[in-house]
Amino acid sequence: MGMCSRQERIQKDIDVVIQKSRAEKDCLFADFRYSDSTFTFTYVGGPRSVSYSVHVSEDYPDNTYVSSSENDEDVLVTTEPIPVIFHRIATELRKTNDINCCLSIKSKLQKENGEESRQNSTVEEDSEGDNDSEEFYYGGQVNYDGELHKHPQLEADLSAVREIYGPHAVSLREYGAIDDVDIDLHIDVSFLDEEIAVAWEVIRTEPIIVRLHCSLTQYLNGPVPTVDVFQISTKERFGLGHQLKKIMQTFVTQQWKQSKEKSNCLHNKKLSEKKVKSPLHLFSTLRRSPSYPPPGCGKSKSKLKSEQDGISKTHKLLRRTCSSTVKTDDVCVTKSHRTFGRSLSSDPRAEQAMTAIKSHKLLNRPCPAAVKSEECLTLKSHRLLTRSCSGDPRCEHNTNLKPHKLLSRSYSSNLRMEELYGLKNHKLLSKSYSSAPKSSKTELFKEPNAEGRRLSLTSGLIGILTPSSSSSSQLAPNGAKCIPVRDRGFLVQTIEFAEQRIPVLNEYCVVCDEPHVFQNGPMLRPTVCERELCVFAFQTLGVMNEAADEIATGAQVVDLLVSMCRSALESPRKVVIFEPYPSVVDPNDPQMLAFNPRKKNYDRVMKALDSITSIREMTQAPYLEIKKQMDKQDPLAHPLLQWVISSNRSHIVKLPVNRQLKFMHTPHQFLLLSSPPAKESNFRAAKKLFGSTFAFHGSHIENWHSILRNGLVVASNTRLQLHGAMYGSGIYLSPMSSISFGYSGMNKKQKVSAKDEPASSSKSSNTSQSQKKGQQSQFLQSRNLKCIALCEVITSSDLHKHGEIWVVPNTDHVCTRFFFVYEDGQVGDANINTQEGGIHKEILRVIGNQTATG
């Protein structure tokens, strides 16, 4: 053990003793000091004070010397850590009031060391107090029989996890000295497609670990555990972990409160009584000290306390938007489930609503709801900030309730089946093309049986995840938040809940966990909603990825995002199409928004955008220097750049040359995915039934700022509509590139000139383009940009073909795949037909197995 780690270990052990001694009301010791490798403390509970000294060596805890001021010649040599030594002294003093008790400990330890080796030693105790000292400390230094005091319910829950998910689905790290255990639940995420996993910054071949820090001997009867979420290989930058950690902490906190009932196990009862009698019982009832975390999980005291409460300082402010946690009383439970929560059988309305459910742990199970359109509550701005019905399914429909009253009222014990479901958008979420979600009726589902939960994650995703169309997209969030029945123990329930939430994380705000509101369903990349408190938390608490990281890994994509933002701002239709408007915290006043969707100032946004250094220059100089230059020119330039990057909800990757479509004749080719796992899996299921093909979608470059953040929408008969809707409402596609080029703003003269009339100016332009090599050619050189997307479309009866113009009314049947950008009037071949065999084959080659088309 190195010197640095040795000192840290000693200091941690001393902190454990000091912290918990001070927390005990009748502590017998005071004057704790540590200097020159000696830890001293004074006994003040007797007729006279006695000082004890613990001298540590370089190979601590080996060769540790213990003595007292009453008998400093007789020294104890031990291999025990400081907390164990202290606990045994305190126990002996309480029992015997003998200030020389150190000697009795010495004799016992010497006898023990003479009989057995250190690794296999078990201290032969004559009293319950000394048995407690073994239980007090266990970190690998003592071969403590952990099975002896491990809570029986914990053993049962661990066995259930291993039986259902396999022996590698859970692992333990026990810390018996402080009555703590780390339970690592391994959540399989291999069901994610590779490109989706990359978009979420998740390693799909490696499980996500949900770590619970809880009491080893008390388990469900102990303090609420803290939660960590991480992947071993991505601990440093695991953005998805921030969101999932908040979700799982809230879930665990709520379920812990529901389950805090004493076990009937006699062993647990005796153990609890013994802990109360222990002189330093606080040592075994508190969780591990914040100064003694497992490797890689260090936390300050303040952070640990915040997590124990299940809510951060900023998140407390978000409580006014209504907690997203679903109480046990609010969840889908079977009539027979009475052990871990109140049975719903007392409410006849609940019994009547019980129906069957599809058997799979990844089903987006809707919470019980019987929604009537006339019961939908219209929320005004600043009332409830678009509170989802998943926050509390039993909310009564009282329009006179003010937010604080609504959030603090005690709910009736009877399950109320009428649901608040239809919500009008809050001002902060209002978008020009957005409409209130339609109210719909959902069924009350039962929990799938255990056999159903054995199915693989991949099979569960195909065809059964709730569609994310405008009329039914609201069902998925409620199903994902529905609490699984605890029929196989708390740990299995926790895994099931994590498996429910992970595929639909993109549908919820990363801060408040309320569902996003979009007209045509959720997008791919998780991000923050537009509620002001969430924006503040997202931009100031380190949840948002740094622009420097994004530029380092995808500079060409950032360059494209900035160009799209500029095109939307310069458009005469910016009032309609520049959505979402930026929400940016003022760097000089973190309590204010410099760019506020409720107070739009397009000129100020353009000024900040003009001050952003070109992305190409950012890649050629130290990023911090570039940032300083931008801050001097305009303090809002860099925050705006951060927003442009973080608000993008689509996954865009610059295609390498070997994966580009040669017939598109542009170096600016991108993989563009905007469909979340649920939509991709539904798309895949539909493809198996009906097949699919490819078609182009043309739209002006100015529209793509919004499309990347809100998806392809049916603009027909809305103010977003730019062209006529001759063939009805839907997304317009074409297998012919020439038609889609027209929709993108390229006129026919440009296309003919580029292909059939090589004028001198065109020749010089082509020559100039061909001479650009290396990094220069990777970035956009012009602000005169045109673009076209290549989409995959389901060939079902819903696809209406009118010659070379196709109309798809169902947005779930269209998934973007590629995006092509052209500069200065340059275009690709205007006569490309995706239905030609060679073209279709080339598209499939480039896509490969990276998306749901595989």
UniProtKB/Swiss-Prot annotation:
Please name the Pfam families in this protein's record. PARP
Biased composition of type Low complexity is found at 760-777
| Cytoplasm as UniProt keyword | no
Give the sites modified to ADP-ribosylcysteine.
Answer: 332, 367, 376, 395
Please report any disulfide bonds recorded for this protein chain, giving both cysteine positions: none
Q: Which purpose does this protein serve, as stated in its record?
A: Mono-ADP-ribosyltransferase that mediates mono-ADP-ribosylation of target proteins.
Specify the protein name: Protein mono-ADP-ribosyltransferase PARP8
